[in-house]
């Protein structure tokens, strides 16, 4: 399944714990960060490196919606750790894998076998904060889940409540707030029925 948009979308602040292949089926997608820009048209794909923060501008074609897919790829075994963010990327992967978990400093400390203060200090030294990372990765999980609907045999509309709960958000308003605050869009813009043809 793919994400479909009849209107231009500007998704901001996206970051996934693994490499992400973006494939455009219809319309145009521009991926960019502070260093580079990659423009994709129908049939093009590009792999965004793991844990790289990027924006995604989606532009439908004339009279046709934009259709694109997101697929996580296993990281290369000798690949780097998110630009020197070893602890943050490892935590992001844990959060993405189990977004419904209660991600607290105590849980993180137990996972890393350090004190909660030391766990927070590790994230801080990499320019990250626990709650921000949790929110970001839950949203990444929700976006990936929305893109995977029907690929896993699910049919019909992607339900906002199911995506929100499955991605660890306490409520639909919390999910909507995260979409607006982190990605800059309302979830209703990308949570819709199956892609055309």
Regions inferred by a protein language model and the residue ranges of each:
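Sequence-specific DNA-binding recognition helix
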Residues: 150-193
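Conserved short histidine dyad/triad with adjacent acidic residue
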Residues: 1-21, 38-40
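DNA-binding recognition helix and immediately preceding turn/loop
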Residues: 87-130, 149-167
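Short, basic, alpha-helical segments at the C-terminal edge of helix-turn-helix-like DNA-binding modules
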Residues: 134-144, 188-197
């Amino acid at each position: 399944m793919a994400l479909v948009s009849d209107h231009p979308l500007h998704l901001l602040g996206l970051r996934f714990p693994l490499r992400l292949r973006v494939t455009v089926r219809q319309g145009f997608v521009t991926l960019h960060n502070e260093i580079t820009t990659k423009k994709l048209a129908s049939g093009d794909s590009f792999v965004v490196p793991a844990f790289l923060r990027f924006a995604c501008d989606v532009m439908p074609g004339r009279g046709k919606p934009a259709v694109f897919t997101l697929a996580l790829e296993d990281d290369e075994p000798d690949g780097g750790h998110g630009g020197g963010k070893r602890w943050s990327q490892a935590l992001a992967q844990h959060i993405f894998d189990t977004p419904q978990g209660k991600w607290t400093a105590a849980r993180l400390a137990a996972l890393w076998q350090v004190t909660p203060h030391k766990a927070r200090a590790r994230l801080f030294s990499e320019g990250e904060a626990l709650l921000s990372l949790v929110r970001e990765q839950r949203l990444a999980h929700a976006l990936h889940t929305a893109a995977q609907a029907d690929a896993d045999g699910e049919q019909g509309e992607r339900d906002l409540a199911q995506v929100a709960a499955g991605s660890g958000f306490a409520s639909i308003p919390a999910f909507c707030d995260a979409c607006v605050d982190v990605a800059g869009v309302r979830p209703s813009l990308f949570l819709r029925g199956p892609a055309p043809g």
